[in-house]
Amino acid sequence: MTTQAYPMALVTQDSLDGYIRSVNSYPMLTADEERDLAERLHYKGEIEAAKGLILSHLRFVVHVARGYSGYGLPMADLVQEGNIGLMKAVKRFNPEVGVRLVSFAVHWIKAEIHEYVLRNWRIVKIATTKAQRKLFFNLRKSKKRLGWFNNGEVETVARELGVEPAEVREMESRLAAVDSTFDLPNEEDDSSSVSTAPVLYLEDKSSDVADNLEAQNWEAHTNNRLAMALASLDERSQHIVRSRWLDDDKATLQDLAEMYGVSAERIRQLEKNAMKKLKMAVGEI
């Protein structure tokens, strides 16, 4: 699959409104329709099935891309990058995982947009290393929980994010002086589309563009990783984890012991092993 094969290759700033109207005209898929296409692609490699999955989800990419408008980057480019992420997700989507494509694809869409933002945010190249990128998209979440950092809190955040304390301090100082982009209004076009020619850069310490991005990304990203990790476990381990941790009506060790005809201690051991495997699987995704 290549971007040249589908309408997403035609996204430009001038034609963005028309593009959005076009992608919104593609019908959304029911769960059964989606699974049928996904199985045809996954098991038979049918390109037309891939096309159907992609076209029906282009509107979702536009929705996600709008959440990144605070960076002052062209919306058409954000959509274009998100479409690349969608195509990668469709290529990797396994219909047997048990989640809808939209839940699986959100991680890939946002990952591509993240890379674009980090490569092209013109005002401040805030994150260049892997550790800095992790901090860039996660530090604000920690700051909202902890407030201003003292030395002990820096150690806590560094441990949570798997980086050095000095890197936390450096990124905190960068984010404290984050730049904001301001564009002069276009008198001929009062739409809310993002201008591609910012004319003034001002420092605004109250600006928090990373907050909006983090809020939209974190939950979907975590849920997607959990679903993929669960799928890596055997059927019994999956059931134990779901019954003990994810179901609304959580089962006791004794409940599961009676179900599987083993002791409660054996279920506890299986649960412990499953959680260990789950943690390792999440870390690898």
UniProtKB/Swiss-Prot annotation:
It holds the Pfam family Sigma70_r4. Transmembrane segments: none annotated. A motif (Interaction with polymerase core subunit RpoC) lies at residues 77-80. InterPro entries: RNA_pol_sigma-70_dom, RNA_pol_sigma70, RNA_pol_sigma70_r1_2, RNA_pol_sigma70_r2, RNA_pol_sigma70_r4, RNA_pol_sigma_r2, RNA_pol_sigma_r3/r4-like, RNA_pol_sigma_RpoH_proteobac. Residues 253-272 bind DNA. Residues 229-280 are annotated as: Sigma-70 factor domain-4. It is found in: Cytoplasm. SUPFAM superfamilies: Sigma2 domain of RNA polymerase sigma factors, Sigma3 and sigma4 domains of RNA polymerase sigma factors. Keywords: Cytoplasm, DNA-binding, Sigma factor, Stress response, Transcription, Transcription regulation. GO terms for molecular function: DNA binding; sigma factor activity. Residues 53-122 are annotated as: Sigma-70 factor domain-2. One of its GO terms (cellular component) is cytoplasm. One of its GO terms (biological process) is response to heat. HAMAP family: Sigma70_RpoH. Interacts with the RNA polymerase core enzyme. Sigma factors are initiation factors that promote the attachment of RNA polymerase to specific initiation sites and are then released. This sigma factor is involved in regulation of expression of heat shock genes. Belongs to the sigma-70 factor family. RpoH subfamily. This is RNA polymerase sigma factor RpoH. It comes from Vibrio vulnificus (strain CMCP6). The gene is rpoH.
